[in-house]
């Protein structure tokens, strides 16, 4: 398995690192994620708000502190993968991707638009 430097990864995987990282400010980013979920759902006029809000803390913790996915190497075969089986929570996934820099605000604003990769339910073809 290819060795990754800490500089190009989202975070360390140790429980201590997760605890230390989340202790700094456990709710600020998750609150921003919730605000994105609500604003994107309102803007698009669709979305499963309850499902997305209920998983916001979990998805933000995974993307913010646990998953090792370099933003510049999304196709790296050795990176972590995330499968969202709770597809109705796609807005939480998309918001996390935006907050971590995987997608732009312009792309986030295409949510549920014609030709967008960001549908109400995530597709397996997304590279993040």
Predicted regions and their residues:
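A short, structure-level motif marking secondary-structure boundaries and short turns
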Residues: 22-23, 43-44, 78-79
């Amino acid at each position: 398995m290819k060795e990754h430097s800490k500089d190009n990864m989202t975070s360390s995987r140790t429980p201590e690192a997760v605890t230390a990282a989340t202790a700094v400010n456990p709710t600020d980013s998750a609150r921003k994620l919730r605000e994105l979920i609500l604003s994107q759902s309102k803007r698009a006029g669709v979305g499963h708000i309850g499902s997305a809000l209920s998983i916001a803390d979990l998805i933000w913790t995974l993307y913010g502190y646990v998953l090792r996915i370099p933003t510049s190497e999304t196709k790296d075969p050795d990176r972590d993968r995330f499968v969202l089986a709770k597809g109705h929570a796609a807005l939480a996934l998309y918001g996390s991707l935006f907050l971590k820099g995987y997608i732009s605000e312009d792309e986030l604003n295409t949510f549920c638009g014609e030709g967008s990769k960001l549908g109400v339910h995530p597709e397996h073809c997304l590279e993040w």
